[in-house]
Amino acid sequence: MIFNQTEKQEKEYLQQVITTIHDTINTTSTSVKEHIDTLQEYKDYLWSNKDIDPHEIRSMRESILNHFALGENVIDKRRRLSKILDIPYFGRIDFQEKKDKSQVSPIYIGIHTFYDLNQKKNLIYDWRAPISSMFYDHELGEAFYSSPAGKINGTISLKRQYRIRKGKMEYMIESSVTVHDDILQKELCSNADNKMKNIVTTIQREQNQIIRNENASVLIIQGVAGSGKTSIALHRIAYLLYAQKGQISSKDILIISPNKVFADYISNVLPELGEETVPETSMGQILSDVIDNKYKHQNFFEQVTELLENPTPDFIERIQYKASFEFISLLDKFILYMENNYFKATDIKLTKYITIPAEFINEQFKRFHRYPIRQRFETMTDYILEMMQLQYNLTVSTPEKNQLKKEIKKMFAGNNALQIYKDFFEWIGKPEMFKTRKNRILEYADLAPLAYLHIALNGNNAQSYVKHLLIDEMQDYSPIQYKVIQKLYPCRKTILGDTSQSVNPYGSSTANMIQKAFATGEIMKLCKSYRSTFEITSFAQKIQPNNELEPIMRHGEHPKILPFKNTEEEIQGIADLVNSFRNSHYTSLGIICKTESQAKELVQKFQIYANDISLLSNQSSAYVKGIIITSAHMAKGLEFDEVIIPQTDDKNYHSNIDKSMLYVATTRAMHKLTLTYSVSSPSCRFL
């Protein structure tokens, strides 16, 4: 007989589970109060008895720490239970182990495990638990999961999905497949939110394989636009924190994200899944830190802006060259050349009677070749003085030792990293490939090679505290940047992005290039696009074709291209579209321009029409829901119910990078897409 066979029985059972959760929360609240009271008693006792002996103090300290730890665990348990009250679970499988023919176990699956002490059993299993993997990976019939005890085989006889909101079951669906299409379609039809949401209820089989992959030391995820790759990567982090509890915590993970807005946009996912937020940084910040923030330089946003607004063939060539593997190979050869030619040993007069021969000093420089060049000077000095002491019984003072090290350091002709970098371009016969801007500002493309050289000279100062590194928007980083990351972070990595969405096409990386840069890596692909309707996805495919992309069969309005007589009429037309949006059921509208300067100009023009429009710029630190005007670069990774793309004429969109920006902009739309342009310019070649 099936446990809770009817919907009525399921609804009654849900209320029983919620009641049990409430009871457990009340019990934990009582327990928290007891721990607080006990800690206060200890505090009062210590305050009143200042003459107690050290043994008693030590014993009490242990008791206090123990109560404090227990109290924190109980508070954490209460927090987790409070989180699941509204939606205790979302799925169920009935599983019978092969070895146990009589017992069919109903497995209810939710965000967190809930174990009832009275019944002595799990009422809810965490979605990350080994047994829960069958919900995502298997249909009805034979199934298995991997447990610490080994592979468990059996049969799934029932699979259900539920929509529960605020403790009430809205509906349940019998499902023979992994995630029922009706559930998926309902979730995809919902409005965009101001924060990325968890997707545990709709994780697909191919996504689940990525989330639970614990074998790959470097996992590279190539995911098409709208495939959920960022969300999947964050769910993967949540899974690893669960599966490797005790070995890794949220503070051991680092996310490299494109900007502060995107970092804010994704900040809710891990807390929703019951984990703490993870530290984040940017590639630019990492590279600046390596070179000790010594040099003024372009940032990535400024490089992209220049490529969009004022590109020159020389600038593009410099970016492309520094993103090649040939460039890395030559840089490695130059580092070897520098080791063999930049150190010119000379005799050092240590005392009136003792001279250290240049040949001996040169031998020591080569002896310690495993050390980074500038780290050798200290080791060489110690070794030379040790030899002098053995041979001449000579004792040297600290100032004399420092003077010797200073003399040895002077023998190396490369104490200015920037000058060495310039030397490199002379050495390869391409001095034109290095160019500083006004006020000696470096180009962004020079930052990673300079950091790479700095590591060769000074050592990598490996960030060993980071146990897992997550890199988003992988396509926007060059191979030399990945080489620097390899040296700084020798940990496991999850790297994700989409080659079709590069805002840096002249210095970008494909999944295969990243694999080559790390000399390892497992590539997994996400080809299904869930964000946009079939019509919007098909439209975007004409701009940037991708044969691997599989659109979801969710239909909606066809994208519109609206021509206007002139710019003034185009602005008025966009204002009318904004008014239509206000009267719709949609909650987010993105007006996406090619550049930030165009976005700022549009905001100025719109001041006479509305005061509820926000500018999302490179200076922004948070994503705001509602009507937003922004650039394609800043919109990357975000999604909107409706998108309007102004100025889609051939004058504005004509280059390769323009095409990438247009593709990024169109793929931000979930339900509705409109492009506008003035007929005073030719229509866009990409449409």
Can you say where each PLM-predicted feature lies in the sequence?
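Extended, charged low-complexity regulatory segments
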Residues: 1-200, 204, 208-212
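Generic detector of solvent-exposed, compositionally biased contiguous segments
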Residues: 54-73, 211-217, 222-224, 228-231, ...
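P-loop NTPase Walker
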Residues: 1-33, 40, 184-303, 636, ...
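Conserved phosphate/pyrophosphate-binding and hydrolysis machinery centered on Walker-type P-loop NTPases
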Residues: 189, 193, 321, 370, ...
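Alpha-helical nucleic-acid-binding subdomain
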Residues: 241-469, 476-484, 492
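A structural signal for short, well-ordered beta-strand segments and their strand-loop junctions
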Residues: 92-94, 220, 255, 674-677
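Phosphate/oxyanion-binding active-site loops and adjacent basic polyanion-contact surfaces
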Residues: 195, 199, 229-233, 446, ...
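Conserved helicase motor core of SF1/SF2 NTP-dependent helicases
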Residues: 246-247, 251, 260-276, 281-286, ...
